[in-house]
Amino acid sequence: MINFQKARDRMVETQLVSRGIHDRRVLEAMRKVPRHLFVDEALKEQAHSDHPLPIGDKQTISQPYIVALMTQSLELQGHEKILEIGTGSGYQAAVLAELAERVFSIERNPNLAYRANQTLQKLGYKNIIVRVADGTLGWPDEAPFDAILVTAGTPKIPQPLLDQLAEGGRLVVPVGDRLAQELVLVESGPEGMKHTNLGGVRFVDLVGKWGWEG
């Protein structure tokens, strides 16, 4: 039988620390969150592998390094209100919930949203709200957000998300075509929005009014 805690520890050391993930809070969150509970039973032994895994409905759970990179880029301190676009399995939301005060997560697929919510509730997370909606529209009723994380690729950054980012906030989003994207960090400041390229990635499509057509 696999010792999943040891598997997580090994994942953190060999995949995250070795590639420059240095935020201690991010590393501890990823040591703690039971990644194997967010994948199908048949894939549990692969849960900590260095690649994405299918979660059904043509969606995936991102590889651990990408989860860590995106999370670290938000520079969370613990007091933040976060918007996540693309709940998927719920794993990224769980990691964020370990590091921030509240997480508002949007998933357009009702089946995925239901399964993710069930898993998160079983694990006892009280600071995550999952909603079925078009993520490209954001969550206006709860805006502004200190941080926004988008877990799907978009041809351009949805304007509603930029509008809902608090001053001093940080947004991480994959931007590009359907085959490959660049991971972009947007920082909102008094002089406007600063964009930084964090490197090449490949995500499933962000479908919605301000993303790709379904």
Curated annotation (Swiss-Prot):
Enzyme class: transferase
Active site (catalytic residues): S62
EC number(s) from the headed UniProt entry: 2.1.1.77
PROSITE patterns tied to this protein: PCMT (PS01279)
Similarity comment text for this entry: Belongs to the methyltransferase superfamily. L-isoaspartyl/D-aspartyl protein methyltransferase family.
Stated role: Catalyzes the methyl esterification of L-isoaspartyl residues in peptides and proteins that result from spontaneous decomposition of normal L-aspartyl and L-asparaginyl residues. It plays a role in the repair and/or degradation of damaged proteins.
Protein known as: Protein-L-isoaspartate O-methyltransferase 1
Organism, as annotated: Syntrophobacter fumaroxidans (strain DSM 10017 / MPOB)
Gene: pcm1
